[in-house]
Design a protein with these regions (language model features):
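Transmembrane alpha-helical segments
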Residues: 71-75, 146, 150-157, 209-221, ...
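Membrane-cytosol interface segments of multi-pass membrane proteins
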Residues: 1-176, 287, 319-357
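Membrane-interface helix termini and inter-helical loops of multi-pass transporters
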Residues: 42-47, 118-120, 124, 186-195, ...
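Aromatic-anchored segments of alpha-helical transmembrane domains
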Residues: 28-35, 103-104, 171-185, 233-247, ...
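Long hydrophobic alpha-helical segments that form multi-pass transmembrane helix bundles
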Residues: 164-220, 231
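Interfacial loop-to-helix transition and helix-capping segments at the boundaries
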Residues: 54-64, 129-143, 184-209, 240-271
Length: 357
């Protein structure tokens, strides 16, 4: 079997199981990233504790690309077709409402706890919401609005592109959405000027290409195990070994090789996503049910997990309790448990379940 060989039955229920596994792993990685960020930003650069935090953070950096790949796998390969009206009447309003409500929650709660909610404060909050000044991790919802808006175009392309065109599209995205933006962020394009500097795609537009990668992989047989392992290892090395010396040199966290759609996170995402496809091919009903339950709550967990982390910090749970090698996974599990409990409560409220989570 050759790598990237198409499967004869690309659109199957088994594919959905693979996406459930991927979403479950991706939300775990999201929480690891935010837990370990306390270590990367608060410990001495290059210390043993800092390196332990960098280890966990590097391993988890495929999270956002994996979520984008899941979107591509789900929405670009529908045998029943895609309806533009449904996107604009259901998907985009869902993201918009969730974005503004949860952005408001993240702004109101700190002010409510630490200062008075005056009319002036509420006016300031409203202006910040309208200007897009939202909690940092909600940037993903901004990206998803663009991904959904472009979906009728990308879906049509996916439905009609032949093998050669598919590979060309993927190569185009790797060059302009992954490599050039990374070189630019590292300052390696400073010698150039003019319109060339506008060639690299921004993260928002590059995300659309990442959904294509998910579609490309899901409708093919799983990559060989050795290739999957190599991609994960390469991605980790780029993130860990690339960030360590750069941070030592600058005296602060140099996160260019950890962020966005840089090569390290993309290698990790592609490797873990392919691993999930392989696991999804196996008959294990119990694991499938667990993955389905966890992935169903992944959007809610993404939205609320920072609130849970702040509550945990308030009651004394942080990465400083013990070494990051242990405290990062421990706090991650606590945060996931608390966030998922919130999901189980909120999903019982019909309009909240429909529009906010």
């Amino acid at each position: 079997m050759q790598p990237f060989e198409k499967t004869p039955d690309a659109v199957t229920g088994r594919r959905i199981s693979a996406v459930d596994y991927a979403k479950t792993f991706a939300i775990l990685c999201v929480v690891v990233i935010h837990v370990s960020s306390e270590v990367l930003l608060g410990r001495q650069i290059g210390s043993a504790a800092w390196l332990e935090g960098l280890f966990w953070s590097s391993l988890a950096r495929g999270a956002v690309p994996m979520f984008l790949m899941c979107s591509g796998a789900l929405f670009m390969d529908r045998s029943g077709g895609l309806y533009v009206r449904h996107i604009w009447n259901r998907n985009i309003p869902h993201i918009l409402i969730a974005l503004f409500v949860w952005a408001a929650v993240y702004k109101v709660i700190p002010r409510f706890l630490h200062e008075k909610l005056t009319a002036e404060a509420l006016h300031t909050i409203l202006l910040e919401l309208l200007r897009g000044q939202h909690e940092g991790h909600l940037y993903f919802l901004h990206i998803m609005l663009l991904v959904y808006a472009a979906l009728p175009i990308t879906y049509t392309f996916a439905a009609h592109a032949d093998e050669k065109t598919e590979r060309y599209a993927l190569s185009f995205w790797i060059l302009y959405g992954v490599l050039l933006p990374t070189l630019k962020s590292l300052g390696l394009l400073q010698a150039f000027s003019g319109i060339f500097l506008q060639w690299p795609l921004t993260l928002a537009w590059g995300a659309i290409g990442c959904t294509w990668l998910g579609h490309f992989l899901i409708k093919r047989k799983p990559l060989p195990v050795h290739l999957t392992a190599a991609m994960i290892l390469i991605g980790f090395i780029i993130c860990f070994a690339g960030t360590w010396p750069r941070s030592i040199r600058t005296g602060k966290l140099s996160a260019q090789l950890l962020e966005g759609l840089s090569p390290g996170p993309c290698f990790l995402a592609a490797g873990f996503f392919s691993l999930c496809i392989r696991i999804g091919k196996k008959e294990n009903r119990k694991m499938e049910r667990i993955a389905k339950a966890l992935s169903s709550g992944s959007f809610c967990v993404y939205l609320v997990h920072l609130l849970v982390l702040r509550v945990l910090a308030h009651v004394g749970f942080s990465t400083s309790c013990f070494r990051p090698a242990v405290s990062v996974p421990f706090l991650t599990l606590l945060c996931l448990l608390g966030s998922y409990c919130i999901y189980l409560i909120l999903k019982r409220i019909p309009w909240v379940n429909r529009w906010l989570i």
